[in-house]
From Swiss-Prot:
PANTHER family: UPF0597 PROTEIN YHAM (PTHR30501:SF2). GO terms for biological process: L-cysteine catabolic process to pyruvate. GO terms for molecular function: L-cysteine desulfhydrase activity. Belongs to the UPF0597 family. This is UPF0597 protein Kole_0595. InterPro entries: Ser_deHydtase-like_asu, UPF0597. Disulfide bonds: none annotated.
Amino acid sequence: MIRLTQYLQSGVKPALGCTEPGAIAFAVSRACKDLPEDEILESIEVKTSINIYKNGMYVVIPGTNGARGNKIAAALGAICGDPSLKLRALKSCNDSHIEKAKRMIASGKVKLSCLRDKPGVYIDVTVKTRNHAARCVIDGDHTAISLVARDGVIVFKGSQREREEPVFFEGEKFPIDEIIETVERIDAKDVDFIFEGVKMNLEIATYAMNEGISLCKPVKENNNSEEELAIRIKRFCAAASFARMAGVPLPVMSSGGSGNQGIVTILPVAITGKSYGKTREEIAKAIALSHLVLGYIKSRLGKVTPTCGAANAAGPAAAAGIVYMLNGSTEQISQAMSTVFSSTLGMICDGAKEACAYKVGFSGEVAYNSAMLALDKSCVAGPQGVVGKTIEETIENIREISTRTALELENTIIDILEKYNK
């Protein structure tokens, strides 16, 4: 049986701002820890995989008054980063740190390059003073340090086993019966932890709507029709994502290494559960199922892909959670997931930025609508298009498309983004 507590500890974590620049700040701060505090930093060199490079290019760093990108994350990691906080390493950032970071970048001390042949999550940082140099490498996961060295001498080396995430899902088969059995045995501590995520993600969405941030408008709570509930889910998801991408200094609960995935995995299920009068434990079980289904999908498609994870992983997962919570069958869970996939397949990832909010909002809405369709015995039945005869076939078809097109698609996106980032 899947160990729910272990999965939640591994795959569901608070994150401040976008995950990728947070990981860069963490890596730089960890490298700087091995340099003498009394020596002036002369240079920071950051090399990243294509996914890290892309996702951090335009996103706002929380607490920086609108400063964007991987370079500012790297500079701040050196100036005020706390490696013990990992993805929240920049929690203590203030105006004086920001100005110092901008001067560091303007002086040419921060170099950033993209390793276009490097897949997945990879960050290689070297920081130098006049007399010393330190290096930190992250590989495989946003907080998985594989190596730390000072002056060429390795001071820490993570084993492959330490760096690899625990394996919870193996093979193509969708283990929905095992997932349901797992969440049915949920304990009180896991319920509390899941509701920490609900509170966190509702809080940032509510903040955005109360402050009137861009597209974030207040949502009326007095209409529980299906149409209005779908709109409410869409707005809450979009507001949480927009605030996060715009640098609001509030954390979100991530899922599968992504804050936007966490928003879609959690909020549609939580909002639906509240509207339908479900108990705290019933909602927690459904969100736990949503997290686990996301984990299964990501195990097949990959942690970072050229397609949008909020749409093509979290959306189907949330639909599964809603169907389960409203007493649907395992067949209806698979049907709801297939309907989401048929709606979201063409949604690519062109980097993290405020516009992601529209994708995240749409993903939450289509998750709810697909769940309602499945419960009403309606779905996109396969085979048609990429939707196969089974949910496993559908996911395998999407994996094949993603794998075959990944390198060319990612490089094309980077070429386009770099035109505007010179």
